[in-house]
Amino acid sequence: MSNASQLQIPNAKLDPRGWLNAAAEDQGFLVVGIGPASIGSVYKDGLSTFLDNAFEGDMDWLRTTASKRMQPQNMWPDAKSAIVLGMNYGPDHNPMDNLSARTAGNISVYARGRDYHDVLKGKLKQLASQFSAKTGNAVKVFVDTAPLMEKPLAQQAGLGWQGKHTNLIDKDSGSFFFLGELYTDLPLPLDEEQTDHCGDCSRCMAA
């Protein structure tokens, strides 16, 4: 996906924000942000503390892939920017209403449709191809299958903040969205990192 086509535009003339927003919306993404390819120290420290306390339980892969999670550029040293995208999967009704039916099973909202890995990967690949055609730069696609700390990356890109229920929260759309990433070797203007707005609130945990 790194080969430029006849549509190539010089990098200096590319409006990454305007073009990315429009292209991402065309692919069905609700939000898009640009952050650094690296992980901030506060998130690295959080993972270290998590592992030091053996909170991973039987999830051994969290420990064996820790170095890549803390430094994503170990997987691609040329990476300069992380384009993080979110796709809404929220239902058109309150899913909590289903819990009132005590004798019926309840399937988590995210699992009621097609496998989101397949859906997002296909759309991200199309977006990556367009990006490479416009910039001539290389792009790599990630959808929850590589050892990336997606929620910290999303917070750094301004998409939201990680709530006490561990999911990413966006002020406008809540937590009902899947995350995907485009890593590129093109340095892009970064969005402002989102801050934690939870305070003393714990409604997500009570739910």
Put a short name on every predicted segment.
Residues M1-H197:
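Auxiliary alpha/beta "docking" domains used to position bulky ligands
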Residues E193-A207:
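Cysteine-centered iron-sulfur cluster-binding motifs in ferredoxin-type domains/subunits
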